[in-house]
A protein has these predicted regions:
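N-terminal periplasmic/intermembrane-space "pro-region" immediately following the signal or transit peptide
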Residues: 19-73, 80-83, 218
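Short, structured loop/turn "capping" segments at alpha-beta junctions
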Residues: 46-48, 53, 252-255, 299
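Short glycine-rich loop/turn motifs
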Residues: 206-208, 257, 284
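Outer-membrane beta-barrel pore domains
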Residues: 24-43, 81, 91-92, 112, ...
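Outer membrane beta-barrel
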Residues: 55-82, 92-252, 330-355, 373-378, ...
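Short mixed-charge
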Residues: 250-265
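Bacterial Sec-dependent N-terminal signal peptides
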Residues: 1-24
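Active-site flanking loop/helix segments enriched in acidic
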Residues: 86-87
Length: 428
């Protein structure tokens, strides 16, 4: 009998300890807010209401914490051979298969009241695709995608150092878990996607230090960063990237923005930014709207315009004249989320219009150079959200239009398609 009472007492003490450790709803909300803040890929709208403010003010009970998550995208696909731009006599043939496209492990933590870190891994190439030597890509070693430390001096001034997503426009700063379309856009990372790209990026990431802050009751956000960019000899000028955004309705504090908020948004945000290194510069503006539209659900609109050039000085050691031609890029995404059925149809349009200078085109005729390099992407899809960003299914069709020269040198427009059926699950 004594043993029974002793065991019961120990069980009661354990339950009380768990309850105290849990801290009730307020503590759980603060923990959820910290998790959303440090795991960059989590859309900010998933944080409990008002909990971010509560967490920021709850300094007396601070304890270091660490959080872990994962993002997985896998799909069945069919794609015409000419979709990627390699137009041959078999360009209209359809390739098909299954792929593990994205598998990221996220680790983040609050190290002190004002200091936090975030790390993220990625697959450098999809598992399951066909390699050039007629074999299947089955063994892929993960790479480090993000690795950054943030110190928040105040709400108006924070420093983020390390490897991070770099862009001057909103679409280029979206997190993978909160996309509305099937994938990132084609022309937001055309020159910093890989190590052999002109800006020598890593899936849009770069190494450096970024300053960020919020003013005017959190309505105005600014970002200004110095990054390595293209590093030829260790003496190249640094890459400078800046951005301002004004939220006319609710503030947004996501470091990596959400592409859609699934009925939880009340956002009209306008932004503008620049990106420059050496002779290269990129300036643009963007608009994001996500808010309730009627009783059925909410609308999401994401639009951007960019002008960029690599300059015309071909003699400079750090010139981008022959790598980044003068161009404009237009982008538009539009979708509607039906909250009752949890379905979201969407459409997308992108256009890259090259208008190179003589120095950039080199020995080619400028007109031929512009036609060969210009292209556009359009398409749409249907998303079904089993559990919001945590689990969803996406069916999409995207077409890419190229200008292709025939044997006589005359250009004509060719369009090739891609179909994806994609599953996303996001653990956090």
């Amino acid at each position: 009998m004594k043993r029974l009472f002793l065991n019961a007492g120990l069980l009661l003490m354990l339950c009380q300890g768990i309850a105290l450790a849990d801290g009730g709803p307020d503590a759980r909300d603060r923990k959820a807010a910290r998790k959303v803040r440090v795991l960059r890929e989590i859309p900010g709208y998933l944080a409990p209401k008002d909990s971010v403010t509560a967490a920021e003010k709850a300094e007396d009970d601070f304890k270091p914490s660490i959080h872990v998550g994962a993002i997985v995208h896998m799909f069945a696909s069919a794609e015409q051979s000419g979709f990627g731009g390699n137009v041959t006599d078999k360009a209209s043939d359809w390739n098909k298969g299954f792929s593990l496209y994205r598998a990221r492990v996220l680790v983040g933590g609050q190290l002190s009241r004002k200091g936090s870190f975030f790390m993220e891994t990625e697959l450098p190439s999809p598992i399951g695709i066909q390699l050039g030597d007629s074999t299947k890509n089955v063994k892929v070693a993960p790479i480090l995608l993000d690795c950054q430390y943030e110190y928040a001096f105040s709400n108006a001034f924070q420093l983020i150092a390390g490897m991070q997503l770099v862009s001057s426009n909103r679409n280029g700063l979206q997190g993978a878990a909160g996309l509305m379309a099937n994938d990132f856009t084609y022309f937001q990372y055309p020159y910093n996607l890989f190590a052999n790209s002109p800006l020598q990026g890593n899936f849009g990431r770069d190494l450096g230090v970024n300053a960020r802050g919020f003013l005017l009751k959190d309505k105005l956000e600014y970002r200004l960063g110095l990054f390595t960019g293209r590093n030829l000899d260790g003496q190249a000028p640094l890459r400078i990237v800046g951005r301002v955004a004004y939220n006319f309705l609710d503030p947004e504090k996501d470091y990596y923005y959400a592409g859609t908020k699934l009925g939880a948004g009340n956002t009209i945000a306008w932004g503008a930014g620049f990106d420059t290194q050496g002779s290269y510069y990129n300036v643009g503006t963007d608009l994001f709207i996500d808010k309730k539209a009627g009783d059925a659900g909410s609308v999401t609109l994401n639009a951007a315009f960019q002008y960029m050039t690599g300059g015309t000085n071909v003699n400079s050691k750090y010139t981008f004249a022959r790598q980044i031609p003068r161009q404009t890029v237009q982008f538009l995404e539009l979708g509607y989320y039906f909250k009752k059925t949890r379905i979201q149809p969407w459409v997308r349009y992108e256009n890259q219009n090259i208008s190179a200078t003589k120095e950039q085109a080199g020995s080619e005729l400028i007109d031929n150079f512009d036609k060969a390099k210009s292209s556009s992407v359009y398409g749409g899809g249907l998303n079904y959200f089993f559990n919001g960003s945590a689990t969803n299914l996406r069916l999409s069709y995207v077409a890419r239009k190229h200008n292709v020269a025939d044997a006589g040198g005359a250009y004509s427009s060719k369009t090739y398609g891609q179909v994806w059926l994609q599953v996303q699950f996001f653990l956090f």
